[in-house]
A protein has these predicted regions:
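Surface-exposed, low-hydrophobicity beta-strand/loop segments enriched in small/polar/acidic residues
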Residues: 2-134
Length: 134
């Protein structure tokens, strides 16, 4: 971000979504080189930004084409990529829930204890530990 004597505030709010439907399970928690991200099923959430990004929260919500499709228990991994390697920085547990017209589908939000500030040229990625249906 540009040097300034005033506090840093987001210039433009940023909201990004990513579907993990029809995604193959990631089987590693190890730092992963750029060339191996696709093979490890680690998927980009946010593109690089010249000014960096402030991430206040990450929400994981079940989605399906059927309102009563059950959630599969799994872990969603959040990865920070520094331009050469992605590092697992957070794991979000997803519990099995069978929603209905009166029961809400699974949703949870991770709020970092302090906002996650990605430096310029960093990206955020995600993965899942279970192969998900379409």
């Amino acid at each position: 971000m540009a040097t300034t004597p005033t506090p840093i505030f987001p210039q433009t709010p940023y909201l990004k979504t990513l579907s993990l439907a029809a995604v193959t399970a990631c089987t590693t928690r190890a730092p992963t080189a750029t060339a191996s991200l696709a093979a490890a099923n680690i998927i980009e959430i946010t593109p690089v930004s010249t000014n960096g990004r402030r991430i206040d929260s990450v929400t994981v919500s079940a989605c399906s084409t059927a309102i009563t499709s059950a959630t599969v228990a799994q872990v969603v991994g959040i990865w920070a990529w520094d331009g050469t390697t992605a590092y697992l920085i957070q794991e979000i547990t997803v519990t099995a829930v069978t929603p209905s017209t009166t029961v809400a589908a699974f949703t949870t939000t991770w709020f970092p204890s302090i906002p996650l500030v990605l430096p310029a040229a960093f990206k955020l990625f995600a993965s899942t530990t279970v192969t998900t249906p379409a």
